[in-house]
């Protein structure tokens, strides 16, 4: 996927902003141990800039890599890094159902992030696919469990995000079927990144309305 293709994705909280939390947030966290004030200021500036110009962080990173003549598969690298918890998305409520939601989302993202290491070993990759399917089901079961137990004024937003997650899960499944025909791993990486992004948006939506 080219930069322009990623930017043209018509979805809220666009996937191009994944670079902010997958790449830069860990940098801010490290800086925070040395200079908390500077880290906080820098984080706020990047968040504001990314909100106003989705994809800006990715543009900056790509320009730096280009200037340093570093050639990497950015989509693959992003997938490898995207499994880490993002504090801004984690649900703080102490009830077990919400902590289960955090845990199931974490498990799914972790399995998806292993795809680049598994995809060239057919046996291991087939097992990874089974693990992903199970993790998706467990996350959806947990979402439904929260729905049953808690009432929300903004239930429509939650239902919408759940439908988006299901849509991208099916898209990921379709991408896998195509991969076994054409062998294009990059499309699997792109689809996995989208699914991780939707997983984070589920957490974000629950955190916002919970």
Swiss-Prot record:
Predominant location: cytoplasm
GO biological process terms on file: angiogenesis; apoptotic process; blood vessel development; blood vessel morphogenesis; chordate embryonic development; Golgi reassembly; heart development; heart morphogenesis
Keywords: Angiogenesis, Apoptosis, Cell membrane, Cytoplasm, Golgi apparatus, Membrane
Record Pfam families: PDC10_C, PDCD10_N
Membrane topology (UniProt): Peripheral membrane protein
Highest rank taxon of the organism: Eukaryota
GO cellular component, one term: plasma membrane
Cysteine pairings via disulfide bonds: none
UniProt-recorded Gene Ontology molecular function terms: protein kinase binding
Annotated compartments: Cytoplasm; Golgi apparatus membrane; Cell membrane
Function: Promotes cell proliferation. Modulates apoptotic pathways. Increases mitogen-activated protein kinase activity. Important for cell migration, and for normal structure and assembly of the Golgi complex. Important for KDR/VEGFR2 signaling. Required for normal angiogenesis, vasculogenesis and hematopoiesis during embryonic development. Required for normal cardiovascular development. Promotes cell proliferation. Modulates apoptotic pathways. Increases mitogen-activated protein kinase activity and STK26 activity.
Family according to the record: Belongs to the PDCD10 family.
Subunit structure: Interacts (via C-terminus) with CCM2. Interacts (via N-terminus) with STK25 and STK26.
Protein name per Swiss-Prot or TrEMBL: Programmed cell death protein 10-B
Species annotation: Danio rerio (Zebrafish)
Lineage: Eukaryota, Metazoa, Chordata, Craniata, Vertebrata
């Amino acid at each position: 996927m080219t930069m322009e293709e990623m930017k043209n994705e018509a979805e809220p909280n666009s996937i191009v902003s994944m670079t902010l939390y997958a790449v830069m947030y860990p940098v801010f966290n490290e800086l925070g141990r040395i200079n908390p004030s500077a880290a906080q200021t820098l984080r706020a500036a990047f968040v504001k800039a990314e909100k106003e110009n989705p994809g800006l962080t990715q543009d900056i990173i790509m320009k730096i890599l280009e200037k340093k003549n570093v050639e990497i598969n950015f989509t693959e690298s992003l997938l490898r890094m995207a499994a880490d918890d993002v504090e801004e998305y984690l649900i703080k409520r102490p009830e077990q159902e919400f902590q289960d939601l955090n845990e199931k989302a974490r498990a799914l993202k972790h399995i998806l992030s292993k795809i680049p290491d598994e995809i060239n070993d057919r046996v291991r990759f087939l097992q990874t696919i089974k693990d992903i399917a199970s993790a998706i089901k467990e996350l959806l079961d947990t979402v439904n469990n929260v729905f049953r137990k808690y009432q929300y004024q903004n239930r429509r937003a939650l239902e919408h995000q759940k439908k988006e997650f299901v849509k991208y899960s099916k898209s990921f499944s379709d991408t896998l079927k195509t991969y076994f025909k054409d062998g294009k791993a990059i499309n699997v990486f792109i689809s996995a990144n989208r699914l991780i992004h939707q997983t984070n948006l589920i957490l974000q939506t629950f955190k916002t309305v919970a």
